[in-house]
């Protein structure tokens, strides 16, 4: 429904953990990732003022040493970018080796670069070509082609797209530096909006999402890869509501009437969006959100 194709796909819900899995992956999955797909439509941007970059690195070094609870309050108050909430408590430094798996055009890595991080790699097998901009390097690679060891491997809404998530996480674990961590951000099938909207929930994103996990299935998935969950944070947003409401009304995400295309033509007014924003803040605080970040570290007893 993102592009209005209205094709139908079948998912099975695990009776044990509640995760959703795509029954049959389309033979030509690439047609569902057209050039305008949002992961590839934003150029890499980089902070290029040396003095400003030095100041950002100094601030990053301070914030990265703070406990996650304090970092969360800074982010909630608008005094620090949200990416610090993701990496809080991991012992990273601005020179940490960070790779974003399924990086698309690298816009998220550019956000890290603006905050003073200096060793940033994005890998994506669907990139047209390798590219570089300042401290951000993009390479056309799959994770099993990645070499070296890394302090942080990130899957920012990419793990749910791969055909074999357990194998992908095992490959990530094998590339971790000592004391390294894996960050997985993705939708959750046991969240409030997922249960409320069912097949019209935007988080399914068929057929691009080959699976949509739950809390229980993430624990199982991590264990199969020799990992354990160190921390969970929640970051759902109002799109889970207004986009799902559009799907109920047969309005695709990128339709001219969609809120994300033209808020002025949307059926939703500021009061409704504000209400959903408020609901999302509540769901995030209560752990009932439809999107979360899982910080994974090696399980010590894994052989």
Indicate where each model-derived feature is located.
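Conserved alpha-helix/loop element of class I SAM-dependent methyltransferases that forms part
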Residues: 58-63, 67-95
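Short catalytic/ligand-binding loop motif for oxyanion handling, primarily in non-cytosolic enzymes
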Residues: 22-23, 30, 107-109, 191-194, ...
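A C-terminal cap/extension of S-adenosyl-L-methionine-dependent methyltransferases
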Residues: 2-4, 234-303
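Residue-level detector of anion-binding/catalytic polar loops
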Residues: 20, 118, 228
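Conserved SAM-binding loop
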Residues: 80-200, 207-224, 291-300
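N-terminal juxtadomain amphipathic helix
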Residues: 1-57
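A SAM-dependent methyltransferase catalytic signature shared across enzymes that methylate proteins
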Residues: 216-235, 269-272
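Short glycine/proline- and charge-enriched loop/turn segments
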Residues: 197-205, 246-252
